[in-house]
Amino acid sequence: QPQWEGLTFSQKMKNMVGDLNVCSKKGLSERFDSTIGAATVLMPFGGAYQLTPQNAMVAKLPVDGETSTCSGMAWGFNPFLMSADQYKGAQMAVIESVTKLVASGFRYEDAYLTFQEYFERLGTAPERWGKPLAALLGALDAQMGLGIASIGGKDSMSGSFEKLDVPPTLVSFATAIGKANKV
């Protein structure tokens, strides 16, 4: 996590542009052909210069003939918030994924969620058990507030290698079916 206290504006800017989290991901995405099958509704990057990443993946359903029915999927996760507060991090992951989906033209009432979780090996330390519990409670709180259920998830509870632990992670994926002309 970047440290900002005691730095000049110039130092803060240099730190920020040196952070891999703010660099362009366009080169990585170009390794995947989004035009295969001619079903893509939203290309990975939009805008006048094709540099703005989309909020969601949207593609028409693969059917015989033509269709306007499409599926959308968006993700939500903030690693800094999740590391600081697992309850709020997971809660906001759910809200962010649904918000991106709605901003892409889908109805939140039609959305479903699925989660991908990674946590350190729990062992016998109570504070380690509290992290995934707090995250799941935060995600549940957001689901209850939105009236949207998670239809499953994949947990990876052994996110440790020797003495290294993965940071607490709960990524929310929101998905829905809609019409391409509404996107």
Language model regions located:
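Glycine/proline-enriched, intrinsically flexible loops and inter-domain linkers
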Residues: 1-183
